[in-house]
Amino acid sequence: MKMTSIQQRAELHRQIWQIANDVRGSVDGWDFKQYVLGALFYRFISENFSSYIEAGDDSICYAKLDDSVITDDIKDDAIKTKGYFIYPSQLFCNVAAKANTNDRLNADLNSIFVAIESSAYGYPSEADIKGLFADFDTTSNRLGNTVKDKNARLAAVLKGVEGLKLGDFNEHQIDLFGDAYEFLISNYAANAGKSGGEFFTPQHVSKLIAQLAMHGQTHVNKIYDPAAGSGSLLLQAKKQFDNHIIEEGFFGQEINHTTYNLARMNMFLHNINYDKFDIKLGNTLTEPHFRDEKPFDAIVSNPPYSVKWIGSDDPTLINDERFAPAGVLAPKSKADFAFVLHALNYLSAKGRAAIVCFPGIFYRGGAEQKIRQYLVDNNYVETVISLAPNLFFGTTIAVNILVLSKHKTDTNVQFIDASELFKKETNNNILTDAHIEQIMQVFASKEDVAHLAKSVAFETVVANDYNLSVSSYVEAKDNREIIDIAELNAELKTTVSKIDQLRKDIDAIVAEIEGCEVQK
């Protein structure tokens, strides 16, 4: 019996995680992740490149060709199209085939990765390819203390990834690579606790955020994430909508070097060509990229919660075009609103931004209240959604989603209380498709629904000191049992009379027993 795609996927996931655990030995999974993820990426680009060269011609097997038959023209054309070049001898399948007997495996892998990256030098793809394998350190002691140990561990990784049933490239199973990669990242994040949440947004939450940002748009120029992590949020937009809807591609910035490389690999693994994505490394708040590429029609983000930033210690920031309109900077101890104002500045007139936020920023005073006033007075706040707790890796906090828009048709602010919409699954809660659909329905209609959603007039928000806390406007359902006092008194009366009767019965029995004893 043929397995269904769901069964195939479940089996693949089981196999991947088993391999990931088998090959790491005593090394912590979190520290070893770049080797498994890197090997998966290496296999992907090798098969992707071979498929491009063969172009559907069954008479050609690129992996069996000799490197010497490759002309400069073939190489030049390939790099212009794919962004990189891999010689037949450098392909994953050829390296993996000899891995167990290659006593120079770690050196050979390093040379191959350097060659792949350097093949893009001087081409438009150079920045997208450069440093992709930087975290795949073939000399690291995490692999073992001796060269022999290192090679054995590397061979185990390659052989493990080689054995994954990821389908033929020509069988439209390309998404299996991306799916396998996302599954691995998700599992590493779940097992890493707090640090895992910093680079991966769970797919169910990503789905909601992508739908909020893209709602009602038949096409967007490009989509942007100012705190991109591993790219999972950006890619969710690709999964939710046809490719042609996002015309110019995917843009993001990430501060952590390892995570930045994961994000770029993730783009390739989801078959996004180098000219359709641009992920930059750096601090979004103090060294923002893409000033020339803005505005963006869709912005999605799950920035770090309440991190410290330089804020008022940098006198130039209050005059920065992103922060100046609000007249105040986000507190140095809580950068949340700095990310919000950055996103707003990068948003187009027809666009939407959906940003995951720490709930405190919606009710605290001081600078944060002034920023809320700026956002509300200028009618940028479309919706605030409170989510259930424990939806994210590394935190049990019940976070909010802030939806910003520059094309609202009224001055109301919508509040949605989705804190009861969740399903318990292992250690975390999840949003089901039905939950997401329910949230999107009320978001789209803007109708008031008891205990779920309320559209609040601008004047009411102002009168409430610009408090944007969902609980201030959506009345929570009272789950306490309603007690009927009259009914309770009647039951009490009946119970008391029963007790009185029982006492009389007991007294009679006692008297009878005592009478019998006297007669004796």
Curated annotation (Swiss-Prot):
Region (C-terminal tail): 481-510
Function per UniProt: The subtype gamma methyltransferase (M) subunit of a type I restriction enzyme. In the presence of the R subunit the complex can also act as an endonuclease, binding to the same target sequence but cutting the DNA some distance from this site. Whether the DNA is cut or modified depends on the methylation state of the target sequence. When the target site is unmodified, the DNA is cut.
A molecular function (GO) term: DNA binding
Residue numbers binding S-adenosyl-L-methionine: E198, F199, F200, T201, P202, Q203, S230, G231, S232, E254
Alphabetized UniProt keyword annotations: DNA-binding, Methyltransferase, Plasmid, Restriction system, S-adenosyl-L-methionine, Transferase
Region (N-terminal domain): 10-190
Catalytic activity annotation: a 2'-deoxyadenosine in DNA + S-adenosyl-L-methionine = an N(6)-methyl-2'-deoxyadenosine in DNA + S-adenosyl-L-homocysteine + H(+)
Organism: Escherichia coli
Further comment: Type I restriction and modification enzymes are complex, multifunctional systems which require ATP, S-adenosyl methionine and Mg(2+) as cofactors and, in addition to their endonucleolytic and methylase activities, are potent DNA-dependent ATPases.
UniProt-listed InterPro entries: D12N6_MeTrfase_N, DNA_Adenine_Mtase, DNA_methylase_A-5, DNA_methylase_N6_adenine_CS, Restrct_endonuc_T1M, SAM-dependent_MTases_sf, T1MK-like_N_sf
Protein name: Type I restriction enzyme EcoR124I/EcoR124II methylase subunit
EC number: 2.1.1.72
GO terms (BP aspect): DNA restriction-modification system; methylation
Region Catalytic domain: start-end pairs: 198-473
Domain of life, per lineage: Bacteria
Domain remark from Swiss-Prot or TrEMBL: The C-terminus is required for assembly of the restriction enzyme complex. The individual domains assume different positions in the enzyme, allowing the holoenzyme to regulate the methylase, endonuclease and translocation states.
Description of how the protein assembles with itself and partners: The type I restriction/modification system is composed of three polypeptides R, M and S; the restriction enzyme has stoichiometry R(2)M(2)S(1) while the methyltransferase is M(2)S(1). There is an equilibrium between R(2)M(2)S(1) and R(1)M(2)S(1); the latter is methylation and translocation proficient but restriction deficient. (Microbial infection) Holoenenzyme interacts with Escherichia phage T7 protein Ocr; this interaction leads to the inhibition of the restriction activity, but may still allow methylation and translocation.
Regions annotated as coiled coil: none
Family to which this protein belongs: Belongs to the N(4)/N(6)-methyltransferase family.
